[in-house]
């Protein structure tokens, strides 16, 4: 052994302070950067490197080089194997970036990571993140195409906000607070996933679609309010997403009215005191649940969107459905809506659509082939009753309940409850 050679891990252990001018403890870089806050590294080198940095720092400077260590897992291949030259299962990041984009690869790695756990790489996961980037890009283009040249950003007065505006602003406040809390706990994957879900499922799939009614309507004030909220929420969403997808967020941000020199210097939305309208949110979510149920029922019965019909809604929350008439017309394909606390009229030829907060009576039989629909329902009922019998027999068997894994028993009970619910709904309809 060469006495003048320092083992690689021991030389690496000196890195936190030896690169900053040490042993000159008056060096500017040393005083500014040492000690630092957080070290991010893999679990495979805790003993080799992390522990050596800590005891070397304490021994030579009297201070630990960092106060927090965030341990992440290893990126493995789609089969869970460690990537190696011998297996030939490694990836070239530059090739992935060329095909899917740097943001997509970055987002996939962040969403797939949980502290200390390994993750599996696959092109399909990167493709899903690229699809999200495309969704965001197209949504942003839609917003920009609907802005007049003299558009002034900023939220409208509260009395100009409708139920959907208050809902999206409240959801924005919630996701900003949740993502901030996740980041404070180093839960990057959870934070990124929540921001992605907000942008895709809440902003794109619901709010943008809802805004089209006002943007294409005759009420200029309502259209302007929708534009202002669209831009405001997009601006904040881009800032929330920026740490995870920096390139596309900067590009879109620069195209927004009133943007600064760079999104990187903008204030983090989670630090703002954004308002939540709890009552309006609850009302709007009741409306959304009902619309989803109607659309699912129509899809199941193969009813074309062009075929619209009247509906009666029985509910203890009439305000939500009375305020949402325009949304029911557009998204639940209603020609007219009657809201009542108790429906006592004829249900002949009607289909029931039930949610926790409402029951809809819809004359669907006039839009479909009655005999064909009855045959479909009977087939579904037979299947549900068969499942009912199978799960009931399993749970009535003492040997199964006693010897099967507890998780399997719970899953069987859940399947039985689902089959019971399905059979009851079919009979009710």
Regions found by a protein language model. Name each.
Residues 110-111, 175:
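A glycine-rich, basic-preceded beta-loop-alpha segment at the flavin cofactor/substrate interface
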Residues 47, 52-60, 195:
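Alpha-helical support elements that line or immediately flank enzyme active sites
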Residues 35-45:
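The substrate-binding groove and active-site-proximal loops of carbohydrate-active enzymes
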Residues 1-10, 14, 59-98, 102, ...:
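Feature 926 captures the class I aminoacyl-tRNA synthetase adenylation module centered on the KMSKS loop
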Residues 117-125:
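Short, solvent-exposed helix-loop connector elements
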Residues 29-36, 117-118, 272-276:
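Short glycine/proline-rich turn/loop motifs
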Residues 46, 96-98, 104-110:
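Aromatic-rich carbohydrate-recognition surfaces in CAZymes
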Residues 15, 19-23:
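Reverse-transcriptase-like RNA-dependent polymerase core
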């Amino acid at each position: 052994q060469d006495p003048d050679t320092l083992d690689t891990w021991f030389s690496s252990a000196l890195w936190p302070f030896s690169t900053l001018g040490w042993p000159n403890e008056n060096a500017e870089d040393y005083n500014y950067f040492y000690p630092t806050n957080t070290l991010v590294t893999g679990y495979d080198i805790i003993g080799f490197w992390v522990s050596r940095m800590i005891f070397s720092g304490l021994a030579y400077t009297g201070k630990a080089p960092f106060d927090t260590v965030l341990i992440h897992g290893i990126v493995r291949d789609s089969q869970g194997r460690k990537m190696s030259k011998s297996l030939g299962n490694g990836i070239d990041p530059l090739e992935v970036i060329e095909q899917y984009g740097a943001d997509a690869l970055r987002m996939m790695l962040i969403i797939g990571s949980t502290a200390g756990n390994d993750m599996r790489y696959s092109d399909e996961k990167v493709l899903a993140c690229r699809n999200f980037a495309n969704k965001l890009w197209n949504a942003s283009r839609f917003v920009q195409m609907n802005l007049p040249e003299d558009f002034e950003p900023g939220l409208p007065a509260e009395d100009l906000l409708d139920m959907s505006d208050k809902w999206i602003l409240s959801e924005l406040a919630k996701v900003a607070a949740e993502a901030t809390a996740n980041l404070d706990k180093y839960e990057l994957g959870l934070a990124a996933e929540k921001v992605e879900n907000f942008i895709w499922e809440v902003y794109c799939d619901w709010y943008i679609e809802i805004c089209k009614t006002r943007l294409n309507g005759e009420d200029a004030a309502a259209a302007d309010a929708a534009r202002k909220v669209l831009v405001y929420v997009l601006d904040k969403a881009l800032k929330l997403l920026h740490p995870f997808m920096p390139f596309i967020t900067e590009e879109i941000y620069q195209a927004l009215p009133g943007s600064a020199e760079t999104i990187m210097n903008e204030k983090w939305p989670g630090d703002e005191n954004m308002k939540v309208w709890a009552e309006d949110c609850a009302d709007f979510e009741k409306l959304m649940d009902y619309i989803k149920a109607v659309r699912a029922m129509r899809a199941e019965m193969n009813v074309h969107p062009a075929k619209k019909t009247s509906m009666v809604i029985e509910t203890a929350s009439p305000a939500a459905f009375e305020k949402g008439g325009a949304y029911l017309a557009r998204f639940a394909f209603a020609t007219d809506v009657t809201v009542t606390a108790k429906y006592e009229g004829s249900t002949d030829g009607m289909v029931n659509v039930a949610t926790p907060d409402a029951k809809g009576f819809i004359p669907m039989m006039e839009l479909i082939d009655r005999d064909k629909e009855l045959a479909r329902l009977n087939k579904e009922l037979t299947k549900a009753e068969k499942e009912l019998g199978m799960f009931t027999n399993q749970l009535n068997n003492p040997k199964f309940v006693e010897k099967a894994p507890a998780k399997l028993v719970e899953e069987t009970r859940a399947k039985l409850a689902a089959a019971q619910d399905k059979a009851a709904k079919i009979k009710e309809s």
